Amino acid sequence: MGKQPLAKKAEMVDEVRSLLQASQMVLVIDYRGLTVSEMNQLRAELRKADAVCMVVKNTLMRRAVADQKAWAGILPFLSGPTAFIMIRGDIPAALKAYQDFAKQTKKTEFRGAAAEGLSLTLDQAKAIAELPPKEVLMAQVAGSLKSVATRLAVGLNAVPTQVARGIQEIPASLARAIRAIADKEAA
């Protein structure tokens, strides 16, 4: 009988580890005061942004991140009742979903976030949330690259044209200079 709870805890740690490995960012929130229906509502909103909200005991989360440096940023936020929002997909969309939920219910408290081994504050997470979606950023980068390529092509195309104009201008300039010298000597 004593091994059964340990086996469940080990299974839970493994599940959390696999979710963390698939995640890009983790938000840590205090969920005190949320009803079951509100928690289910939050989970449903987060699912749309490819994020998962889990309530995990802090000791189990410590075990799950113990050997993963990428998630060491979570450790400072592990105190009291804690829920973890593991974002696998669109980070700005998931952060916005959480922020909208928090504004609506006024019952959750954002403790912090972690990504790439760093701890993030609310302001840092909000700055990320205000970024355009991934597809828009990719389109902007592609547009910038296309613009650079176009400018380069136009510039390279202009060089031979300008060289040709310069070559054509040499005889005309030489003729004007000779005419000016002749006019000066005649005067």
Swiss-Prot record:
Presence of the UniProt keyword Ribosomal protein in the record: yes
GO molecular function: large ribosomal subunit rRNA binding; structural constituent of ribosome
Highest taxon in the source lineage: Bacteria
Family annotation (Pfam families): Ribosomal_L10 (PF00466)
Database matches in Gene3D superfamilies: 3.30.70.1730, 6.10.250.290
Keywords per UniProt: Ribonucleoprotein, Ribosomal protein, RNA-binding, rRNA-binding
The keyword Oxidoreductase belongs to this UniProt entry's keyword annotation: no
Subunit structure, interactors included: Part of the ribosomal stalk of the 50S ribosomal subunit. The N-terminus interacts with L11 and the large rRNA to form the base of the stalk. The C-terminus forms an elongated spine to which L12 dimers bind in a sequential fashion forming a multimeric L10(L12)X complex.
Protein name (record): Large ribosomal subunit protein uL10
Source organism (scientific name): Synechococcus sp. (strain JA-3-3Ab)
